[in-house]
Amino acid sequence: MKAYFYDNLPGDQRLPHDSGKEVTVAELEKVGVLYFRFPDVEGVNTLAAERGYKNRDEIIVSPEKMGAIYETKVRQFFDEHLHEDEEIRYIRDGAGYFDVRNEGDEWIRIKLVKDDLIILPAGIYHRFTTDDTNYIQAMRLFKEEPKWTPLNRTEGLDENPYRQEYVTQFLKAQAEQA
């Protein structure tokens, strides 16, 4: 895993866009993002039991697997959105980027590779893309039945109760500590 501020320069979303300003695991935790590295599935199973993740599936995002819809799907994943559930991904192969917003509404880019596991809290604005290899295989973990319902960032979404809870728990807490 490598985390840094996104450079916001134009160009292919699958390129690194590395500003050169590193972000630590502790800084990720301040915005509610949890990172783990598990060389085998046993560690994932233990975490799943501890956190109540009852269901899982696997997804491969690649042109070979997805065919003609690949480019459309990758652009869709890159639309800024939030979920009303935690988003948990364990990378089985390949690589990709999760971008998350910090308390200053800046993008933090998180590159994940094989054996990395990330947990994004409900209500965090984020987006995803593969890297320039155009391939990632990930295990998705869920507390309940598998679902992936993105709520794209629009005017008024900040009033969503899951967004409000996220802001209170993480962003306002940071502002009060500053």
UniProtKB/Swiss-Prot annotation:
Ni(2+) binds at residues 81, 83, 87, 126. Pfam families: ARD. Its EC number is 1.13.11.54, 1.13.11.53. GO terms for cellular component: cytoplasm; nucleus. It catalyses: 1,2-dihydroxy-5-(methylsulfanyl)pent-1-en-3-one + O2 = 4-methylsulfanyl-2-oxobutanoate + formate + 2 H(+); 1,2-dihydroxy-5-(methylsulfanyl)pent-1-en-3-one + O2 = 3-(methylsulfanyl)propanoate + CO + formate + 2 H(+). InterPro entries: ARD (IPR004313), ARD_euk (IPR027496), RmlC-like_jellyroll (IPR014710), RmlC_Cupin_sf (IPR011051). Belongs to the acireductone dioxygenase (ARD) family. This is Acireductone dioxygenase. It comes from Neurospora crassa (strain ATCC 24698 / 74-OR23-1A / CBS 708.71 / DSM 1257 / FGSC 987). The lineage of its organism: Eukaryota, Fungi, Dikarya, Ascomycota, Pezizomycotina.
